[in-house]
Amino acid sequence: MTKAIYNHDYFAELYCINNGDPWQYEQRWYEKRKRDMTLAVLPYPKFKNGIEIGCSNGVLSAELAERCEALLCMDANSTAIQLANQRLIHNHVKVVQGIVPLDLPTQQFDLIVASEMLYYLEENILLQLIEWMNTYLSPQGCIVACHWRHAIEGFSLNGEQVHQILKQRLHYYYYTQLQDADFFLDVWTHDINSIAAQEGLL
């Protein structure tokens, strides 16, 4: 396996747009609303050790950092890493450049976030990432995936296919889903009990 699995030129061109924010994370209400909904579906108020795979310029990461005692933010693009480092000036946040699945850490996490990046992967690479998730989610952990549900050009997978594969291959309890008109948002947990049950309400 080589680093050709990452389309360097595509993302290098993309991050030249809008000062490194080609999706306008900071300008669009759509993006702000989606971040708020992603944070709202997290089943626990705090996490010991989180990872965001494909952190981009760190806009979502900054809000995840408020929920994590330690947060690892990973992206393959050097411009994204530079921008994320400028934004995430917290002692408990680490930003690293790396390619999925080659550079994934071999440690457990109780929060794994993949937002708007899995459809960039070839299916065999996605399956390797899922295998990693099945190995390194801690017993009290959760996985959150959020992806655009409309057409995507130039890649072999779309958001719907990604979430179907996740549902088929993840070994965890499918805790909740939110099917917005524009995106899929799904959560898996290690614990099969609902939050109400965990807090003694049931």
Predicted regions and their residues:
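Class I (Rossmann-like) S-adenosyl-L-methionine-dependent methyltransferase catalytic domain
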Residues: M1-P45, N49-P105, L121-T135, G141-L202
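A short acidic, Gly/Pro-enriched loop at the edge of an enzyme's catalytic core
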Residues: L104-I112
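A short beta-strand submotif of the Rossmann-like class I SAM-dependent methyltransferase core
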Residues: A114-M117
